Amino acid sequence: EDNQLSQLDITQITKLERLYCNVNQLSELDVSNNTEIQNLNCDSNQLQHLDVSKNIKLEYLKCNDNQLSELNINNNRELVELECGSNKLRKLNISGSLNLSSLLCETNELDSIDVSKNIELSSLNCRDNQLLNLDVSKNIKLQDLECAGNELSNLELNKNVELTFLSCSGNELKELDLSQNI
C-alpha cells in the first residue's frame, strides 16, 4: 500500500485472504490463483482490467481510481461492499451480488444501474454518472443515497423510509416527494 510498485506477482500465494495494494502504479493485477481472497483493495493504480471471476469468496472489493472500462462481478455472490468509483465503467451488473450492502460507483460513465435485486443495499453512491433513471423502490434498507450530477428527471423515494442522507443536486428533477421520509 502507498508505494511505487509497477508489478506485483502474488500468483504463488494461493492462501492469501486480504490484499491491499492501493496507491501504486500497477497496470495489471492477476488474482486468478488467489481463490481464498476475501478483501481486495487496489484503489489508485493504473489498472485497465481486473478479473475477479475466480475470487468467489470476495466480500470487499475496492478498485476506485483506476482506468477500468468493465468490471465483471457475476461470480462474486458473497460481495458485501463494492467501491469502483472514478473509472470508465459504462455498465455494471450487480444483480448476482445479493448480499451487497454498500455500492460506490460514482464518477463513471454509467447511463443505467439496476439495484432491484440488491435488497440489502443500505448505501448507494452513484453520483456524477449519466443516469437517466434510478429505481430504488426495492431497496427499503437504503439509508444513504448520493445520486447528484446525473440526468435524473424523476426520483421516487416513498418506500425508502430508512433514508437519513440524500444528495440529488445537479439533476433534471422538477419535484421530489419526501413526505414518507420523516
What are these regions (language model features)?
Residues 1-6, 174-182:
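Low-complexity/repetitive intrinsically disordered segments
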Residues 17-21, 38-42, 59-63, 80-84, ...:
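Conserved hydrophobic beta-strand positions in leucine-rich repeat
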